[in-house]
């Protein structure tokens, strides 16, 4: 059965909202096991995002702690969203963070990262389909950023759920993932 992204967003938002804290913690541990299978040795700059606990997002901070321990040379950066222009840029992490208008943590805007410097990116999502198209929160920030970042970036989705059937309404502006990790599998798309 095929589904459009709006329907998928609704279904996946409900599924994620129904997760308990214990279920999220267990799935984060399983996601970490999948992430340990990735060779991070060629990554120099990894773009990530601060998880929204109230939205039951995967705990990227747990994943980063693991990566930083084994690969201390990797530099992490995080997005700052410009709501007025619907654009987003990444900045190297800072010890202190600020909250944006949506209540999302952001680094202080000191060291902007050129898109071509990012090797790998954790891409937030609600879910994904069998071709690597993601469904996010519907604002298009990541698709716009990835379009200007170029082809070389590894786009890794991290999902609590397995892929859905293919979305019926993808278009040329949708940037597919390189891979997506779930608690039970890793899916490669490129």
Whereabouts are the PLM-identified features?
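N-terminal active-site beta-alpha-beta segment that forms phosphate/nucleotide-binding
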Residues: 2-99, 103-109
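Conserved phosphate- and dinucleotide-binding cores of soluble alpha/beta proteins
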Residues: 84-190
């Amino acid at each position: 059965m095929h589904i459009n992204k709006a329907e998928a967003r609704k279904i996946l938002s409900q599924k994620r909202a129904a997760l308990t804290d214990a279920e999220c913690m267990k799935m984060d541990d399983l996601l970490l096991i999948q992430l340990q299978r990735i060779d991070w040795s060629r990554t120099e700059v990894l773009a990530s995002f601060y998880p929204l606990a109230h939205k039951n997002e995967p705990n990227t901070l747990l994943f980063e702690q693991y990566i930083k321990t084994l690969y201390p040379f990797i530099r992490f950066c995080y997005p700052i969203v410009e709501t007025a222009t619907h654009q987003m840029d990444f900045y190297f992490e800072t010890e202190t963070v600020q909250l944006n208008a949506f209540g999302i943590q952001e680094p202080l805007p000191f060291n902007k990262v050129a898109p071509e410097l990012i090797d790998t990116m954790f891409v937030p999502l609600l879910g994904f389909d069998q071709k690597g198209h993601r469904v996010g929160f519907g604002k298009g920030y990541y698709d716009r950023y990835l379009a200007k970042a170029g082809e070389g970036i590894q786009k890794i989705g991290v999902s609590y759920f397995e892929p859905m059937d293919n979305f019926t309404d993808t278009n040329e502006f949708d940037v597919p993932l390189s891979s997506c990790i779930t608690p039970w599998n890793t899916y490669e798309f490129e």
